[in-house]
From Swiss-Prot:
Protein name: Translation factor GUF1 homolog, organellar chromatophore
Family statement drawn from the similarity comment of this UniProt entry: Belongs to the TRAFAC class translation factor GTPase superfamily. Classic translation factor GTPase family. LepA subfamily.
GO MF term set: GTP binding; GTPase activity; ribosome binding
Function according to Swiss-Prot or TrEMBL: Promotes protein synthesis. May act as a fidelity factor of the translation reaction, by catalyzing a one-codon backward translocation of tRNAs on improperly translocated ribosomes.
SMART domains: EFG_C
Keyword GTP-binding applies: yes
Record-level GO cellular component terms: organellar chromatophore; plastid
Source organism (scientific name): Paulinella chromatophora
Keywords (A to Z) from UniProt: GTP-binding, Hydrolase, Nucleotide-binding, Organellar chromatophore, Plastid, Protein biosynthesis
Residues binding GTP, per UniProt: 16-23, 82-86, 136-139
Length: 602
């Protein structure tokens, strides 16, 4: 590996919406610069989780260092910092942007600009990055690069006269992209003489070396055996090794300002090396940390229970291990009369929740029951205190609380013009407040709504996709709490409260949700030998009920004719047995019933 001066280092990332070809483009850049030999190449090289390749999305950040001989004959070092494209991981995106001086904006030439592209572009513009527009997938028959150019100019306001057209799949335009990175992205600022400041943009847990931290040196230099201080967690460590990612790690003696690398220092948990934290030297610390570090707060909560109670310790260990590499995951033990022991977990969003659930089932071989997701409510109590509630079953009683506030989001939907009617209908059904509507081009519209997060986390995304045949895309940001007329809806199965089915709903919707829920449960819960009443109640008032009729054994089958009193005796005996059974009997509720809350189109 050559050691290049600062003027020949370029740090850049790739911004794109899901499926616009970002990972494929990264593959081509690695191949074209000879960083990865053709025989080692596999698709989505930087997506190293099996789940990432399967879903075709980037979850964890990756980094790679490439060498490129430019047209002027000099060898340049290009550090690619890969970013996730999904809205749930927007904090990770903002940190990786901070570690760069430029960004490739990849837009699918057949699809045009989408919601997440925009959100990330605005983050990049805030960091003053040099943005190079790249129109990908021009080999597709439906590609229309000219229309997409106009869209980028109209929506984002970027000059697209120098936009590069390419096809990452076939390799067209890759050398132009490499040349543009060298020519148009500025080199890092020379700050080698200043005290060490390095930004952590990712970390993962290695069972042998502890946490491996990926960082970008902003000023000063860092060497093996240095004693470092992490400014947010205030922890001190001695460095065991420092190195660069090629992809694959290679040790070096030191890294200076402008370079990207990794370090290992026997750090025990990812929580100690938080993403966005600043690394400095313990004996010569920097005066202030790099800006932009925030604690990531979970937004969506749900209960995870093992189907087999014996797996509870395994689930606890699996969550502890996952948390080592995923600092955004929060969990605490919870118990439920219907489900036994489990955990209440907090996630950044629905995709994050699905990914954690899949990783638990795949990597740790667990069989899980997941309760419906809920958001964090703010309850104002009569004694002037406030309580944050993430589990509807723990909501304080109506006599103790004054009001309930729920989180609201600002929602942006990008859609072809022909679908805006059905989307406006969907947002109104979900208690949305219309803000404005803008025409981006003659046939593309952006809708702005403010609506409760609780209405978004269930099946809003699926509904939006199915109503627009997959053409619409959305992006949301939290905008704070607002009071609403909310009530707690309890579900009673055989006169026993089923905690996992408890939901918090708006009073106007309570009856419809309750009715839909008990009808759904009636379909899903298997019949028993006795009658099962299903009730939905607000406090002590039942507002909807259904009952599952009993399976009846024909006890008179053996009586041919004979005296009526004999038949009565048998029927009374059966009725007595059923009565006892009803008092003692326990109803097993299948997993589908707990997800009924989710699939109910509120």
């Amino acid at each position: 590996m050559t050691d290049a001066p600062l003027s020949r280092i370029r740090n850049f990332c790739i911004i794109a919406h899901i499926d616009h070809g970002k990972s494929t483009l990264a593959d081509r850049l690695l191949q074209d610069t000879g960083t990865v030999a053709a025989r080692d190449m596999q698709e989505q090289f930087l997506d190293n989780m099996e789940l990432e390749r399967e879903r075709g999305i980037t979850i964890k950040l990756q980094a790679a260092r490439m060498e490129h001989i430019a047209n002027d004959g000099e060898a340049y070092i290009l550090n690619l910092i890969d970013t996730p494209g999904h809205v749930d991981f927007s904090y990770e995106v903002s940190r990786s942007l901070q570690a760069c001086e430029g960004a490739l904006l990849v837009v699918d030439a057949s699809q045009g600009v989408e919601a997440q592209t925009l959100a990330n572009v605005y983050l990049a513009l805030e960091q003053n990055l040099e943005i190079i527009p790249v129109l990908n997938k021009i080999d597709l028959p439906g590609a229309d690069p000219e229309r997409v150019r106009q869209e980028i100019e109209a929506i984002i306001g970027l000059d697209t006269s120098k936009a590069i057209t390419c096809s990452a799949k076939t390799g067209i335009g890759i050398s132009e992209i490499l040349q543009a990175i060298v020519e148009r992205i500025p080199p890092p600022v020379d700050a080698i003489e200043e005290p060490l400041k390095a930004l952590i943009f990712d970390s993962y847990y290695d069972p042998y070396r502890g946490v491996i931290v990926y960082f970008r040196v902003m000023s000063g230099q860092i060497k093996t055996r240095d004693k470092i201080l992490l400014m947010a967690s205030k922890k001190n460590y001695e460095l065991d090794e420092v190195g660069i990612m090629i992809p694959g790690e290679r040790k070096v003696d030191s890294l200076h300002a402008g370079e990207v690398g990794y370090l290992a220092a026997s750090i025990k948990s990812v929580a100690d090396a938080r993403v966005g934290d600043t690394i400095t030297l313990a004996n010569n610390p920097a005066n202030n940390a790099l800006p932009g570090y925030t604690e990531v707060k979970p937004v969506v909560f749900c209960g995870l229970f093992p189907t087999d109670a014996d797996q509870y310790p395994d689930l606890r260990e699996a969550l502890a291990r996952l948390q080592l590499s995923d600092a955004a995951l929060k969990y605490e033990p919870e118990t439920s009369s219907a489900m036994g022991f489990g955990f209440r977990c907090g996630f950044l969003g629905l995709l994050h929740m699905e990914i954690v659930q899949e990783r638990l089932e795949r990597e740790y071989d667990l069989d899980l029951i997941v309760t419906a997701p809920s958001v964090v409510y703010k309850v104002n109590m009569i004694d002037e205190s406030t309580v944050m509630v993430d589990n509807p079953a723990t909501l304080p009683g109506p006599q103790k609380r004054k009001s309930i506030e729920e989180p609201y989001v600002k929602l942006e939907i990008y859609t072809p013009n022909s679908y805006n009617g059905t989307l406006m209908e969907l947002c109104q059904e979900r208690r949305g407040e219309f803000i404005d509507m803008k025409y981006l081009t003659t046939d593309r519209v952006t809708l702005h709504y403010e609506l409760p997060l609780a209405e978004v986390v269930t099946d809003f995304f699926d509904q939006m996709k199915s109503r627009t045949k997959g053409y619409a895309s959305m992006e949301y940001n939290l905008i704070g709490y607002r009071p609403n007329d909310l009530v707690c809806l309890d579900i009673l199965i055989n006169n026993e409260k089923a905690d996992p089915l408890t939901t918090i709903v708006h009073r106007d919707k309570a009856y419809n949700v309750a009715k839909g829920l008990v009808e759904k449960l009636k379909e899903l819960i298997p019949r028993q030998q006795f009658k099962i009443p299903l009730q939905a109640s607000i406090g002590s008032r039942v507002i909807a009920s259904e009952s599952i009729s009993a399976i009846r054994k024909d006890v008179l089958a053996k009586c041919y004719g004979g005296d009526i009193s004999r038949k009565k005796k048998l029927l009374q005996k059966q009725a007595k047995g059923k009565k006892r059974m009803k008092a003692m009997g326990k109803v097993d509720v299948p997993q589908e019933a707990f997800m009924a809350v989710l699939t109910l189109n509120k």
